[in-house]
């Protein structure tokens, strides 16, 4: 499966990030592969909602937590 990517289900929308808010930070549960069942935080470009399946190229990297402005 590594040549095509790893499917992951969006379980929570964390927030919007990026200069114009064009990127959404989400928590996903990996559905297949070596890290099956693991929940990680990733940045997703484009429209996304809870329950969507996204294909990740790799499952090692995790996005940094969004910091709130003061």
From Swiss-Prot:
Keywords associated with the record: Ribonucleoprotein, Ribosomal protein
GO BP: maturation of SSU-rRNA; ribosomal small subunit assembly; translation
Glycoprotein keyword on record: no
InterPro entries in alphabetical order: NA-bd_OB-fold, Ribosomal_eS28, Ribosomal_eS28_CS
GO terms for cellular component: cytosolic small ribosomal subunit
Record bears the keyword Oxidoreductase: no
NCBIfam families, alphabetized: PRK04007.1
The protein's name in its UniProt record: Small ribosomal subunit protein eS28
Provenance organism: Thermococcus kodakarensis (strain ATCC BAA-918 / JCM 12380 / KOD1) (Pyrococcus kodakaraensis (strain KOD1))
């Amino acid at each position: 499966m590594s040549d095509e990517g790893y499917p992951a289900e969006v379980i929570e929308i964390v927030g919007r990030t990026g200069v114009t808010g064009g990127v959404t930070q989400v928590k996903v549960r990996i559905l297949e592969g070596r890290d099956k069942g693991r929940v990680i935080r990733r940045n997703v470009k484009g429209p996304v909602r809870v329950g969507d399946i996204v294909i990740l190229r790799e499952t090692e990297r995790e996005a940094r937590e969004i910091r709130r402005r003061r």
